């Protein structure tokens, strides 16, 4: 498994999500592929570590398998790397968006599917704790039937959306939102009152996983330098 190919796939899937946003069917399709690549990257880091530490794991490499073989061989440096990775991975996911991605990945791994995707209105310029308004339209096979119907429903929901978001914006001395500064996008919800925009989440998360790859390789190099 080639990590660099997987990170390139993440970038491609992120662009495809942006292209098809907010269509639930296509966003779900490419977001699923994005998450599969993320899981492959994490396993790929331990595949590289398996080679560099000389553990000779022949089956599919995961962190658990890596730990089992390192314990069996009493390879303290390999165990140090795994412990470092766990701490580093946890730290990288402390911020809200990476934390949400981690929860979505866990949900998908446990349920073999993503949480339900919904279409919501948001302001084009994002501010912390902004209000999002769900819009419901007819779908065919989970696909948007017509952009015209979507636009009609956005227009219908706009007055109440602007009233609520601008009350919040005014309270926080933030720029006012007008009807020309709203857009629809696909969101997922894992927890009450915590809707996460998928396109934006992927844009934020790709640099996080890139950093995790680079720093993991540096740590492996540091721990195997004497070998």
Q: How does the language model describe each region?
A:
Residues 29, 33-36, 43:
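Glycine-rich, low-complexity intrinsically disordered segments
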Residues 40-52:
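Extended, well-ordered alpha-helical segments in internal regulatory regions
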Residues 1-32, 50-227:
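Acidic, Ser/Thr/Gly/Pro-rich intrinsically disordered interaction regions
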